[in-house]
Amino acid sequence: MPSYIVVGGQWGDEGKGSVIAYLALKDEPEVIARGGVGTNAGHSVFINGKKYAVRQLPTGFMQTKARLLVGAGVLVDPEVFFHELEHLKDFNVRGRVGIDYRCAIIEEKHKQLDRSNHHLHEEIGTTGSGCGPANADRVMRRAKLAKDIKELEPYLTDVAAEVNDALDDGKLVLIEGTQGFGLSLYYGTYPYVTSKDTTASAIASDVGIGPTRVDDVIVVFKSFPTRVGAGPFPTEMPQEEAERLGLVEYGTVTGRRRRVGWFDFEFARYSARINGATMLALTMLDKYDGEAFGVTDYDKLPKRAKEFVEEIEERVGVPVGLIKTGPELEHVIDRRENI
């Protein structure tokens, strides 16, 4: 069975959580591993009308048959980790989750520095979760690791070994990325970026698999891209225009209002290229065309919505395999068998 990576193609908040949740339930992967930076990114999913938000654990938690893993490249905040174990107790997460023993730890001092540093908090617009300072400590080889935290002992494992063993055994592995391409430390709008790379290559490294073991890369794009905090946003629209279009959103972690823009085809093409996208997922098509809300058959999409999808495929050069037409898990058009 294959492995596939899901990453964001813009500045985060693309709707990766809803795409991952759909794949987790539809494809029934036996292992779901989270890469990415740490607790600075929140993923939200709606299940039976109830909203669940996670910052530490894999977003595919609702697939109760899956082993849930947090890769060595991910920063762990024990406070957030144990909160989410309790928050998701209805899904028996506690008995299924494993943290790589090499994960670096976010301490209270990291969060305090993140929030008090003028450059990070006021100019860059950090989430204040402590990820940047914690990653800096890791680079300086002075960060604590998960194996140093007694409370985490029951959950420690070698994630890289587990993931590769699963692939050797023919199991389906879903790998989650966080944030988005535009926030990559290397390829994003530096210095208004996160504290490490966020591309598919980095996410694979985070969980310990080599590039030849990745079968598909799904890059997620939002019909109207958004951005939280400072930094260039070439296609940004005025707040008044966003309000007129009903595009008022707030960040999962920070609660700050998101900046909204028009779809940037050139940026999307570059993002898809660097990520090595084999397929795109498009979210919030119903915001682009209200008549697309809840549609699950591509042939039944209204003309305007369908033309938008086709323009993305033509100009980005990658097929759109998944389309979200609403917030619920079932609001999906799945075209993967046809591409």
Swiss-Prot record:
List of residues binding IMP: D13, E14, G15, K16, N40, A41, G42, H43, T127, R141, Q179, T194, R256
Record text on cofactor binding: Binds 1 Mg(2+) ion per subunit.
GO cellular component terms attached to this protein's record: cytoplasm
Compartment list: Cytoplasm
Subunit structure: Homodimer.
Family: Belongs to the adenylosuccinate synthetase family.
Protein name: Adenylosuccinate synthetase
Organism of origin: Thermococcus kodakarensis (strain ATCC BAA-918 / JCM 12380 / KOD1)
